[in-house]
Amino acid sequence: MEATAASTSLPDPGDFDRNVPRICGVCGDRATGFHFNAMTCEGCKGFFRRSMKRKALFTCPFNGDCRITKDNRRHCQACRLKRCVDIGMMKEFILTDEEVQRKREMILKRKEEEALKDSLRPKLSEEQQRIIAILLDAHHKTYDPTYADFGQFRPPVRGDEEEGTLPSRSSSAHAPSFSGSSSSSCSDQYTSSPDTMEPASFSHLDLSEEDSDDPSVTLDLSQLSMLPHLADLVSYSIQKVIGFAKMIPGFRDLTAEDQIVLLKSSAIEVIMLRSNQSFTMDDMSWTCGSRDYKYQVSDVAKAGHSLELIEPLIKFQVGLKKLNLHEEEHVLLMAICIVSPDRPGVQDPTLIEAIQDRLSNTLQTYIRCRHPPPGSHLLYAKMIQKLADLRSLNEEHSKQYRCLSFQPECSMKLTPLVLEVFGNEIS
């Protein structure tokens, strides 16, 4: 038989249970693997190789049927060698000296190639690792996965309508599950938090004077039972987004005016991004703790939004969920979303772009270094596409929010912070 390129012959991994201790078929010692076509220990492996290379001829001093054990295996070489052959060890599997040398050279070459690949593989710089650590800390400080604060909002009222009822397209009901509204008391309660920005910080910007140019749009106020609760939820979420943004490396280097523009224009997008953490594809809902805070599509409709927003929102949530982002990728995407130089009204797009480029480069390097295939395939491009999807959602949200806020009965339920952020969007 032709000599093989390896000193061992490995059977199919399924041929033995890895959890069962391996025993040498020759002496009963602990086996280290399949050697020369049989399961043996290192000692019997070496004995068989030496015996075959020397073409040794052994004679048993007894009756030729000695029992070989770990303790007496050196006493009778003849019976030990016979036992090796009996369990299937084959001399054809032994490498020649030349083959051994070639194998060593191949192993060395492979190690050198791996070392070269490793040296060329992108690595996160210390600065990039610092950025990721800061963003993770910022996210953990501004996102409570227990949703303990939800009990402080005005209670959810779902009415008599069945939970599965969906709004129609261009329905008069538009729902701010992500639109933004909260009672003044709720807003005041959270503005004292150190990781939030007071609504007054937006007050120097002029309020929009736009009027609804669609007289056919009316709101059935009786169908907006979830508006107060979801209003408080969004107002709370806006403040948490502000807290997160203030910790983005470089964000505080921007002028106060640019910080405000970026926050106002990205707030709803980041809320949608963050809500993916509680979104479940099993029933297309957002689960935030107890059953009272499990939000269905119908709840979004009962706060004022139509399918023109709800359908693409659900599609966005499902698509984002399927990307299986690491938490590091998620926080970087949120930061990139906030620090966007193409937002209307920014004064220093060059500085904003420099900050965003640093975040984008960190994200791309992280994906190459830490996100294994196949999930990493085109992942960065898919994430950037999600930002484009958010822009479309933001635009539709703005349209529906304006229709909602023009109704005095509805605007009374909105907090000052929500009115400032969503009522004065830069178009």
Curated annotation (Swiss-Prot):
Provide an example Pfam family for this protein.
zf-C4
Explain the post-translational modification.
Ubiquitinated by UBR5, leading to its degradation: UBR5 specifically recognizes and binds ligand-bound VDR when it is not associated with coactivators (NCOAs). In presence of NCOAs, the UBR5-degron is not accessible, preventing its ubiquitination and degradation.
Residue numbers binding Zn(2+) 1:
C24, C27, C41, C44
The protein here is known as: Vitamin D3 receptor
Q: Where is this gene product found?
A: Nucleus; Cytoplasm
Report the CDD domains cross-referenced here: NR_DBD_VDR, NR_LBD_VDR
**Which molecular-function annotations from GO does this UniProt entry contain?**
bile acid nuclear receptor activity; calcitriol binding; lithocholic acid binding; nuclear receptor activity; nuclear retinoid X receptor binding; nuclear steroid receptor activity; RNA polymerase II cis-regulatory region sequence-specific DNA binding; vitamin D response element binding
Which UniProt keyword terms apply here?
A: Cytoplasm, DNA-binding, Metal-binding, Nucleus, Receptor, Transcription, Transcription regulation, Ubl conjugation, Zinc, Zinc-finger
Zn-finger regions (NR C4-type) at which positions? 24-44, 60-79
- Provide the domain comment: Composed of three domains: a modulating N-terminal domain, a DNA-binding domain and a C-terminal ligand-binding domain. The 9aaTAD motif is a transactivation domain present in a large number of yeast and animal transcription factors.
**Motif 9aaTAD: where in chain:** 416-424
Q: Please name the SUPFAM superfamilies in this protein's record.
A: Glucocorticoid receptor-like (DNA-binding domain) (SSF57716), Nuclear receptor ligand-binding domain (SSF48508)
> What does the record give as the DNA-binding region?
21-96
Span list, region Hinge: 97-126
Q: Which Gene3D superfamilies match?
A: Erythroid Transcription Factor GATA-1, subunit A (3.30.50.10), Retinoid X Receptor (1.10.565.10)
Q: Which GO terms describe its biological process?
A: apoptotic process involved in mammary gland involution; calcium ion transport; cell differentiation; cell morphogenesis; decidualization; intestinal absorption; intracellular calcium ion homeostasis; intracellular receptor signaling pathway
